């Protein structure tokens, strides 16, 4: 059985090394129920380099799709891309006491799941059509920013606890209607939105959403 002083010294060495290399930070929680928590982090220069690499991969006219969308499926299927995105977003919100990560089906799921994994919190999936296996749901109507149509999104009542601090994560922002819809849905659960982050956004200048971050613009 190791002495407490020896363990403390080892933790101090690991903490210093991780912070120096930009791997993450080590937090200690005192008390009988405490312990050691590892929080992934990424240095600013590493994040900028990863974002620039992604931007280069996306700088291809063949990715442009009808309706102003961008083809992202191949990138979001790569573990290294998800690793970088997840770490960048989680690093920005690791001190915001996030309770859950929310996204809308389906393309945003891999990113949201990776972010939730790094933050060690649940992730919830909002759907436009509920499944019978989800039980009772809460639904809201929202205005699609790109088409100005009224659409619906739903979330299982058991998925999100009241009073949660929720981080919204999605793959693409066109006009902002989907993010606004998720914010309204979060309010229906008596919860708050900690922030909204998207992988990339369209070149449209008149987005209908504010207070969001984009990895690639």
Regions inferred by a protein language model and the residue ranges of each:
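Key DNA-contact positions within bacterial/archaeal DNA-binding proteins
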Residues: 5-9
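DNA major-groove recognition helix of helix-turn-helix
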Residues: 10-11, 18
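Short glycine-rich phosphate-binding loop at a beta-alpha junction
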Residues: 98-105
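PRPP-dependent phosphoribosyltransferase catalytic core
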Residues: 184-217
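Active-site-facing substrate-recognition patch
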Residues: 37-97
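Minor-groove-contacting beta-hairpin "wing" of winged helix-turn-helix DNA-binding domains
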Residues: 24-39
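Short, glycine/charge-rich flexible loops or terminal/linker lids adjacent to PRPP-binding catalytic cores
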Residues: 121-166
């Amino acid at each position: 059985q190791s002495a407490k002083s020896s363990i403390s010294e080892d933790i101090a060495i690991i903490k210093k090394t991780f912070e120096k290399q930009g791997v993450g930070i080590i937090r200690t929680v005192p008390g009988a129920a405490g312990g050691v928590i590892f929080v992934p982090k990424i240095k600013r220069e590493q994040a900028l380099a990863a974002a620039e690499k992604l931007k280069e991969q996306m700088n291809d006219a063949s990715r442009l799709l009808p309706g102003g969308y961008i083809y992202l499926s191949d990138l979001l299927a790569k573990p290294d891309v998800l690793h970088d995105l997840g770490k960048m977003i989680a690093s920005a919100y690791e001190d915001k006491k996030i309770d859950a990560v929310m996204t809308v089906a389906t393309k945003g799921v891999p990113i949201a799941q990776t972010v939730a994994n790094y933050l060690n919190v649940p992730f919830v999936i909002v759907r436009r059509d509920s499944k019978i296996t989800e039980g009772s749901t809460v639904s809201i109507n929202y205005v699609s920013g790109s088409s100005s149509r009224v659409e619906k999104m739903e979330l299982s009542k058991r998925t999100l606890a009241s009073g949660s601090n929720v981080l919204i994560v999605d793959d693409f922002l066109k006009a902002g209607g989907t993010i606004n819809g998720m914010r309204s849905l979060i309010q229906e659960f008596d919860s708050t939105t900690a922030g909204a982050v998207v992988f990339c956004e369209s070149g449209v200048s008149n987005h209908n959403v504010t207070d969001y971050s984009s990895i690639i613009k």
